[in-house]
Amino acid sequence: GVDIEAGERAVDRMKAHVAATRRPEVLGGLGGFAGFFDASALGKYRHPVLATSTDGVGTKVAIAQAMDVHDTIGFDLVGMLVDDLVVVGAEPWFVTDYIACGRVDPNRIANVVKGIAAACAKAGCSLLGGETAEHPGLLAPEEYDVAGATTGAVEYDEILGPQRVQEGDALLAVASSGLHSNGYSLVRKVLLADAGWTLDRHVDELGRTLGEELLEPTTVYASDLLALVRQVEVHAMSHVTGGGLANNLARVLPDDLVATVDRSTWTPAPIFTLVQQVGDVSQPDIEATLNMGVGMVVVMPEANISEAIEVLAGRGLSAWQCGHVSRRGGPDEPGAVLVSSHSRS
Protein backbone atom coordinates (compact mmCIF):
# COMPACT_ATOMS: atom_id res chain seq x y z
CA GLY A 1 0.00 0.00 0.00
CA VAL A 2 0.84 3.69 0.06
CA ASP A 3 3.00 4.94 2.95
CA ILE A 4 1.09 7.96 4.28
CA GLU A 5 3.60 8.72 7.04
CA ALA A 6 6.52 8.80 4.60
CA GLY A 7 4.59 11.28 2.49
CA GLU A 8 4.01 13.51 5.50
CA ARG A 9 7.71 13.39 6.41
CA ALA A 10 8.58 14.37 2.84
CA VAL A 11 6.27 17.41 3.06
CA ASP A 12 7.83 18.46 6.37
CA ARG A 13 11.34 18.29 4.89
CA MET A 14 10.47 20.35 1.83
CA LYS A 15 8.64 23.18 3.63
CA ALA A 16 11.76 25.28 4.22
CA HIS A 17 12.77 24.98 0.56
CA VAL A 18 9.32 26.04 -0.61
CA ALA A 19 9.18 28.96 1.85
CA ALA A 20 12.42 30.35 0.41
CA THR A 21 10.68 30.93 -2.95
CA ARG A 22 7.74 32.85 -1.54
CA ARG A 23 6.69 35.99 -3.44
CA PRO A 24 4.53 38.68 -1.78
CA GLU A 25 1.53 37.59 -3.86
CA VAL A 26 1.49 34.07 -2.36
CA LEU A 27 -1.30 33.54 0.17
CA GLY A 28 -1.27 30.74 2.73
CA GLY A 29 1.27 27.95 3.10
CA LEU A 30 2.08 24.44 1.96
CA GLY A 31 -0.32 21.59 2.69
CA GLY A 32 -3.69 22.96 1.61
CA PHE A 33 -5.82 21.62 -1.21
CA ALA A 34 -4.86 24.53 -3.45
CA GLY A 35 -2.16 27.17 -3.74
CA PHE A 36 -3.24 30.82 -3.72
CA PHE A 37 -1.65 33.66 -5.69
CA ASP A 38 -3.07 37.17 -5.36
CA ALA A 39 -4.34 38.06 -8.85
CA SER A 40 -4.46 41.76 -8.02
CA ALA A 41 -0.84 41.66 -9.23
CA LEU A 42 -2.40 41.89 -12.69
CA GLY A 43 -3.37 45.46 -11.85
CA LYS A 44 0.05 46.75 -12.87
CA TYR A 45 -0.66 45.65 -16.47
CA ARG A 46 -2.68 47.70 -18.98
CA HIS A 47 -3.84 44.55 -20.83
CA PRO A 48 -2.58 41.48 -18.95
CA VAL A 49 -2.25 38.12 -20.66
CA LEU A 50 -1.60 34.93 -18.70
CA ALA A 51 0.94 32.49 -20.12
CA THR A 52 1.39 28.88 -19.03
CA SER A 53 3.67 25.98 -19.83
CA THR A 54 3.89 22.30 -18.84
CA ASP A 55 6.94 20.06 -19.18
CA GLY A 56 9.15 17.35 -17.71
CA VAL A 57 12.81 16.35 -17.88
CA GLY A 58 12.58 13.21 -20.02
CA THR A 59 14.99 10.34 -19.44
CA LYS A 60 17.60 12.53 -17.72
CA VAL A 61 15.84 11.38 -14.57
CA ALA A 62 17.31 7.90 -15.16
CA ILE A 63 20.81 9.38 -14.79
CA ALA A 64 19.84 11.08 -11.52
CA GLN A 65 18.49 7.79 -10.17
CA ALA A 66 21.58 5.84 -11.23
CA MET A 67 23.88 8.46 -9.67
CA ASP A 68 21.69 8.81 -6.56
CA VAL A 69 21.85 12.59 -7.01
CA HIS A 70 18.41 14.15 -6.92
CA ASP A 71 18.62 17.91 -6.34
CA THR A 72 19.76 18.84 -9.85
CA ILE A 73 16.85 17.13 -11.62
CA GLY A 74 14.42 19.52 -9.92
CA PHE A 75 16.52 22.46 -11.12
CA ASP A 76 16.29 21.03 -14.65
CA LEU A 77 12.51 20.86 -14.42
CA VAL A 78 12.12 24.54 -13.64
CA GLY A 79 14.53 25.48 -16.43
CA MET A 80 12.40 23.59 -18.93
CA LEU A 81 9.26 25.31 -17.63
CA VAL A 82 10.10 28.97 -17.08
CA ASP A 83 12.31 29.29 -20.15
CA ASP A 84 9.43 28.20 -22.35
CA LEU A 85 7.45 31.03 -20.76
CA VAL A 86 10.07 33.77 -20.97
CA VAL A 87 10.48 33.42 -24.74
CA VAL A 88 7.10 35.14 -25.22
CA GLY A 89 8.18 37.90 -22.85
CA ALA A 90 6.20 36.61 -19.86
CA GLU A 91 7.40 36.88 -16.28
CA PRO A 92 6.95 33.50 -14.54
CA TRP A 93 4.95 33.88 -11.34
CA PHE A 94 4.69 30.41 -9.90
CA VAL A 95 5.46 26.75 -10.48
CA THR A 96 3.60 23.62 -9.41
CA ASP A 97 5.26 20.22 -9.53
CA TYR A 98 4.22 16.58 -9.78
CA ILE A 99 6.46 13.75 -8.57
CA ALA A 100 5.39 10.15 -9.21
CA CYS A 101 7.42 7.47 -7.42
CA GLY A 102 7.37 3.77 -6.64
CA ARG A 103 8.03 4.44 -2.96
CA VAL A 104 8.18 7.72 -1.08
CA ASP A 105 11.69 8.24 0.24
CA PRO A 106 11.39 11.49 2.23
CA ASN A 107 15.04 12.47 1.73
CA ARG A 108 14.96 11.80 -2.00
CA ILE A 109 11.72 13.71 -2.54
CA ALA A 110 12.95 16.60 -0.40
CA ASN A 111 16.13 16.79 -2.49
CA VAL A 112 14.13 16.91 -5.73
CA VAL A 113 12.03 19.74 -4.28
CA LYS A 114 15.19 21.47 -3.03
CA GLY A 115 16.37 21.69 -6.65
CA ILE A 116 12.97 22.89 -7.84
CA ALA A 117 12.99 25.61 -5.18
CA ALA A 118 16.56 26.70 -5.99
CA ALA A 119 15.67 27.18 -9.66
CA CYS A 120 12.43 28.98 -8.75
CA ALA A 121 14.48 31.40 -6.66
CA LYS A 122 16.84 31.91 -9.61
CA ALA A 123 13.88 32.60 -11.90
CA GLY A 124 12.13 34.87 -9.40
CA CYS A 125 8.98 32.76 -9.15
CA SER A 126 7.29 30.90 -6.30
CA LEU A 127 6.92 27.17 -5.83
CA LEU A 128 3.21 27.40 -5.14
CA GLY A 129 2.36 23.74 -4.62
CA GLY A 130 2.71 20.23 -5.88
CA GLU A 131 1.81 16.58 -5.62
CA THR A 132 3.85 13.55 -4.65
CA ALA A 133 2.11 10.37 -5.82
CA GLU A 134 3.24 6.93 -4.68
CA HIS A 135 2.59 4.26 -7.33
CA PRO A 136 3.68 0.87 -5.95
CA GLY A 137 3.49 -1.83 -8.59
CA LEU A 138 3.58 0.70 -11.41
CA LEU A 139 7.05 2.09 -10.63
CA ALA A 140 9.91 0.26 -8.92
CA PRO A 141 10.67 1.48 -5.37
CA GLU A 142 13.69 3.54 -6.50
CA GLU A 143 12.02 4.96 -9.61
CA TYR A 144 10.37 8.35 -9.95
CA ASP A 145 9.44 10.89 -12.59
CA VAL A 146 8.97 14.64 -12.34
CA ALA A 147 6.82 17.10 -14.24
CA GLY A 148 5.45 20.53 -13.60
CA ALA A 149 3.66 23.60 -14.83
CA THR A 150 4.29 27.32 -14.61
CA THR A 151 2.10 30.38 -15.01
CA GLY A 152 3.08 33.98 -15.59
CA ALA A 153 1.93 37.18 -17.25
CA VAL A 154 2.88 39.51 -20.07
CA GLU A 155 1.54 42.80 -21.39
CA TYR A 156 -0.57 42.08 -24.49
CA ASP A 157 1.25 44.55 -26.72
CA GLU A 158 4.65 43.32 -25.49
CA ILE A 159 4.23 39.65 -26.42
CA LEU A 160 7.30 38.46 -28.31
CA GLY A 161 7.01 36.21 -31.35
CA PRO A 162 6.76 35.89 -35.14
CA GLN A 163 4.59 39.00 -35.48
CA ARG A 164 7.58 41.16 -34.46
CA VAL A 165 10.37 39.51 -36.48
CA GLN A 166 11.61 41.51 -39.47
CA GLU A 167 13.80 40.88 -42.48
CA GLY A 168 17.35 41.91 -41.57
CA ASP A 169 17.07 40.97 -37.89
CA ALA A 170 20.12 39.37 -36.30
CA LEU A 171 20.31 36.14 -34.32
CA LEU A 172 21.96 36.15 -30.91
CA ALA A 173 22.98 32.74 -29.54
CA VAL A 174 23.11 32.28 -25.77
CA ALA A 175 25.33 29.44 -24.57
CA SER A 176 23.92 26.33 -22.92
CA SER A 177 25.55 24.70 -19.90
CA GLY A 178 25.62 21.36 -21.72
CA LEU A 179 22.94 18.92 -22.79
CA HIS A 180 20.30 20.63 -20.62
CA SER A 181 17.33 18.19 -20.51
CA ASN A 182 16.97 16.94 -24.07
CA GLY A 183 18.49 14.11 -26.08
CA TYR A 184 19.15 11.78 -23.16
CA SER A 185 17.60 8.76 -24.84
CA LEU A 186 20.15 9.13 -27.65
CA VAL A 187 23.03 9.88 -25.27
CA ARG A 188 22.23 6.91 -23.03
CA LYS A 189 21.99 4.60 -26.04
CA VAL A 190 25.27 5.79 -27.58
CA LEU A 191 27.48 6.08 -24.50
CA LEU A 192 25.95 3.66 -21.99
CA ALA A 193 24.15 0.93 -23.93
CA ASP A 194 26.24 0.70 -27.12
CA ALA A 195 29.70 1.89 -26.02
CA GLY A 196 29.40 0.28 -22.59
CA TRP A 197 30.68 3.32 -20.71
CA THR A 198 29.84 3.69 -17.01
CA LEU A 199 28.70 6.85 -15.28
CA ASP A 200 31.77 6.83 -13.00
CA ARG A 201 34.14 6.71 -15.97
CA HIS A 202 36.49 9.71 -16.06
CA VAL A 203 36.43 11.21 -19.54
CA ASP A 204 39.50 13.30 -20.33
CA GLU A 205 37.72 15.40 -22.95
CA LEU A 206 35.13 16.38 -20.34
CA GLY A 207 37.53 16.86 -17.44
CA ARG A 208 35.21 14.92 -15.13
CA THR A 209 33.17 11.74 -14.95
CA LEU A 210 30.52 10.98 -17.52
CA GLY A 211 27.83 11.04 -14.84
CA GLU A 212 28.86 14.48 -13.64
CA GLU A 213 28.69 15.81 -17.19
CA LEU A 214 25.28 14.27 -17.85
CA LEU A 215 23.85 15.74 -14.64
CA GLU A 216 25.06 19.29 -15.39
CA PRO A 217 21.99 21.41 -14.53
CA THR A 218 19.97 23.15 -17.21
CA THR A 219 20.61 26.89 -17.40
CA VAL A 220 17.69 28.93 -16.07
CA TYR A 221 17.65 31.99 -18.33
CA ALA A 222 14.35 33.57 -17.30
CA SER A 223 15.42 36.48 -15.08
CA ASP A 224 18.42 37.28 -17.28
CA LEU A 225 16.42 37.38 -20.51
CA LEU A 226 13.65 39.43 -18.92
CA ALA A 227 16.33 41.91 -17.86
CA LEU A 228 17.59 41.94 -21.45
CA VAL A 229 14.12 42.64 -22.83
CA ARG A 230 13.75 45.58 -20.45
CA GLN A 231 17.00 47.14 -21.71
CA VAL A 232 17.23 46.21 -25.39
CA GLU A 233 14.69 45.85 -28.21
CA VAL A 234 13.94 42.14 -28.73
CA HIS A 235 11.56 40.70 -31.33
CA ALA A 236 11.44 36.99 -30.48
CA MET A 237 13.24 34.28 -28.54
CA SER A 238 13.56 30.54 -29.10
CA HIS A 239 14.22 27.99 -26.34
CA VAL A 240 16.39 25.28 -27.91
CA THR A 241 14.94 22.03 -26.56
CA GLY A 242 13.67 18.84 -28.21
CA GLY A 243 14.01 19.05 -31.98
CA GLY A 244 17.22 21.05 -31.92
CA LEU A 245 18.25 24.52 -32.98
CA ALA A 246 16.73 24.82 -36.46
CA ASN A 247 13.34 23.34 -35.60
CA ASN A 248 12.85 25.50 -32.52
CA LEU A 249 14.07 28.65 -34.23
CA ALA A 250 11.65 28.15 -37.12
CA ARG A 251 8.76 28.19 -34.61
CA VAL A 252 9.29 31.90 -33.84
CA LEU A 253 9.54 33.14 -37.44
CA PRO A 254 6.76 34.28 -39.78
CA ASP A 255 6.12 32.11 -42.84
CA ASP A 256 7.83 34.48 -45.26
CA LEU A 257 11.19 34.68 -43.45
CA VAL A 258 14.08 32.27 -42.88
CA ALA A 259 16.76 32.22 -40.18
CA THR A 260 20.28 31.33 -41.31
CA VAL A 261 22.57 30.12 -38.51
CA ASP A 262 26.34 30.10 -39.10
CA ARG A 263 27.95 27.12 -37.35
CA SER A 264 31.41 28.70 -37.66
CA THR A 265 30.52 31.27 -34.98
CA TRP A 266 30.95 28.77 -32.14
CA THR A 267 32.56 25.51 -31.07
CA PRO A 268 30.22 22.99 -29.40
CA ALA A 269 31.31 21.72 -25.98
CA PRO A 270 33.13 18.35 -25.96
CA ILE A 271 30.05 16.35 -24.89
CA PHE A 272 28.36 17.06 -28.23
CA THR A 273 31.28 15.97 -30.42
CA LEU A 274 31.82 12.98 -28.14
CA VAL A 275 28.29 11.69 -28.65
CA GLN A 276 28.51 12.31 -32.38
CA GLN A 277 31.87 10.56 -32.81
CA VAL A 278 31.34 7.60 -30.47
CA GLY A 279 27.89 6.92 -31.88
CA ASP A 280 28.75 7.80 -35.48
CA VAL A 281 25.68 10.05 -35.45
CA SER A 282 25.05 12.07 -38.62
CA GLN A 283 25.11 15.87 -38.49
CA PRO A 284 21.38 16.20 -39.27
CA ASP A 285 20.46 13.67 -36.57
CA ILE A 286 22.67 15.18 -33.86
CA GLU A 287 21.41 18.70 -34.62
CA ALA A 288 17.79 17.56 -34.54
CA THR A 289 18.31 16.01 -31.10
CA LEU A 290 20.85 18.06 -29.09
CA ASN A 291 21.19 21.81 -28.56
CA MET A 292 24.86 21.74 -29.72
CA GLY A 293 25.84 24.40 -27.19
CA VAL A 294 23.07 26.95 -27.80
CA GLY A 295 20.33 27.09 -25.18
CA MET A 296 18.52 30.18 -26.41
CA VAL A 297 18.38 32.26 -29.57
CA VAL A 298 17.30 35.90 -29.39
CA VAL A 299 15.97 37.54 -32.58
CA MET A 300 16.59 41.28 -32.52
CA PRO A 301 17.68 44.32 -34.55
CA GLU A 302 21.32 43.94 -35.54
CA ALA A 303 22.10 47.40 -34.19
CA ASN A 304 21.37 46.15 -30.66
CA ILE A 305 23.54 43.03 -30.73
CA SER A 306 26.63 44.52 -29.06
CA GLU A 307 24.59 46.00 -26.22
CA ALA A 308 22.75 42.71 -25.72
CA ILE A 309 26.01 40.75 -25.53
CA GLU A 310 27.26 43.22 -22.92
CA VAL A 311 24.06 43.00 -20.85
CA LEU A 312 24.15 39.20 -20.81
CA ALA A 313 27.89 39.09 -20.07
CA GLY A 314 27.22 41.27 -17.04
CA ARG A 315 24.80 38.61 -15.85
CA GLY A 316 27.25 35.75 -16.42
CA LEU A 317 25.94 34.51 -19.76
CA SER A 318 28.03 33.99 -22.89
CA ALA A 319 26.35 35.19 -26.09
CA TRP A 320 27.38 35.88 -29.68
CA GLN A 321 25.88 36.80 -33.04
CA CYS A 322 25.21 33.55 -34.89
CA GLY A 323 23.18 34.51 -37.95
CA HIS A 324 20.50 36.62 -39.57
CA VAL A 325 16.92 36.67 -40.83
CA SER A 326 16.17 37.08 -44.53
CA ARG A 327 13.37 36.64 -47.07
CA ARG A 328 12.27 33.03 -47.54
CA GLY A 329 12.46 31.62 -51.06
CA GLY A 330 9.15 29.78 -50.93
CA PRO A 331 6.72 27.84 -48.73
CA ASP A 332 8.56 24.56 -49.33
CA GLU A 333 11.83 25.88 -47.91
CA PRO A 334 12.65 25.31 -44.22
CA GLY A 335 12.12 28.17 -41.78
CA ALA A 336 15.66 27.88 -40.40
CA VAL A 337 18.89 26.50 -41.84
CA LEU A 338 22.38 25.85 -40.48
CA VAL A 339 25.33 26.63 -42.76
CA SER A 340 29.13 26.33 -42.71
CA SER A 341 31.01 24.15 -40.18
CA HIS A 342 31.78 24.56 -36.49
CA SER A 343 35.08 26.19 -35.67
CA ARG A 344 37.61 24.03 -33.84
CA SER A 345 38.79 25.06 -30.41
Spans of features found by a protein language model:
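A generic alpha-helix surface/boundary motif
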Residues: 76, 185, 269-270
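Hydrophobic face of alpha-helices
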Residues: 11, 110-113, 184
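Short, acidic Gly/Pro/Ser/Thr-rich loop/turn segments
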Residues: 7, 43-45, 57-60, 155-158, ...
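Glycine-rich phosphate/pyrophosphate-binding loop regions near the starts of catalytic domains
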Residues: 16-177
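Short, acidic (Asp/Glu-rich) active-site segment that either coordinates a divalent metal cofactor
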Residues: 54, 145, 158-210, 246
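Short loop/turn motifs at secondary-structure junctions
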Residues: 89-91, 186, 233, 318
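Glycine-/charge-enriched secondary-structure boundary and capping motifs
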Residues: 1, 16, 108-126, 139-146, ...
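N-terminal amphipathic/basic leader segments beginning at the initiator methionine
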Residues: 1-25
